């Protein structure tokens, strides 16, 4: 199935039914009075988080969703039927943005979470409501109100605890295959991974965490090189980043230069995401002669001026991978416990997530501005025909 992580749709709630203008007419009741019923409420549009979905591809082919209208009222004080609510399923991890106001309406982070995105129109009132001591035969009714209509943008971000970061062909997909049941495509050429992959790393019966592998970055990704930065958004929900570095690249490039380029592109995408804890994972040590490994590792760490944790692994053979995932699990457990016990740590995490959402809105606004600009430029183009004068010659 094709992976689609962005989509734009239109939702429209149902219109409320109009109130009825009617008078009671029965035998021997010449002046029965008003009996017009109320219209029905329209249907609202709701989104529901569904953990069985992992792509927004359905919204690529159906972009308009409308809830039914309420039915009009009838005589004999009969109310119109309400329009049924429309429930639209979205993948867990979907951020819902109003394209017109850029308001973040909701972040669907749990299965079964329900979000109202378009409020139904209210019913109209029948003439029975306007009867009074001075107006025994009112001819007044009210129409149903229009349902809310919205232009929505969905941005899906995978739900993961740990994210893998690195250049293409650094061994990220091999690592996630080694420590989980995920089976992403692995090959000896760059950009093998074209979409994010998730793997559940199990360390015991009830101990596990989710790892995300995203397509690799290259220098200039912030300017559109390679696959650009669009997949980095899938790391914004993670708590820990593992920077995977190939110590023996096949093109004989400098691993330090590649690592610095990735760090720069990460900062270009999100200054807040760049503040996340990041561990250095030196991969493919098995490709180096054993006597060269310590000096190579020391050289990379020293030139990067790396002060955080460093792990030396071979993803293809599995050497060092268990120590890495066990350390990551311990760190995640300690972090969650700290946030549960320390209000300052909890607020810090919430503030980081808020800042990343603000950055996401800013990126969406910039993207929409770029889309609007060509249209505005077309409108402003000078057209000589606009100033043509039609001349009619008299016979």
From Swiss-Prot:
Region (Disordered): 128-147, 340-395
GO cellular component: cytoplasm
Pfam families associated with the record: GTP1_OBG (PF01018), MMR_HSR1 (PF01926)
Record function comment: An essential GTPase which binds GTP, GDP and possibly (p)ppGpp with moderate affinity, with high nucleotide exchange rates and a fairly low GTP hydrolysis rate. Plays a role in control of the cell cycle, stress response, ribosome biogenesis and in those bacteria that undergo differentiation, in morphogenesis control.
GO molecular function: GTP binding; GTPase activity; magnesium ion binding
Cofactors required: Mg(2+)
Protein name: GTPase Obg
SUPFAM superfamilies in the cross-refs: Obg GTP-binding protein N-terminal domain, P-loop containing nucleoside triphosphate hydrolases
EC number: 3.6.5.-
Gene assigned in the entry: obg
Residues reported to bind GTP: 166-173, 191-195, 213-216, 283-286, 314-316
Binding locations of Mg(2+): 173, 193
Record key words, sorted: Cytoplasm, GTP-binding, Hydrolase, Magnesium, Metal-binding, Nucleotide-binding
Bias kind Basic and acidic residues: ranges: 340-368
Family: Belongs to the TRAFAC class OBG-HflX-like GTPase superfamily. OBG GTPase family.
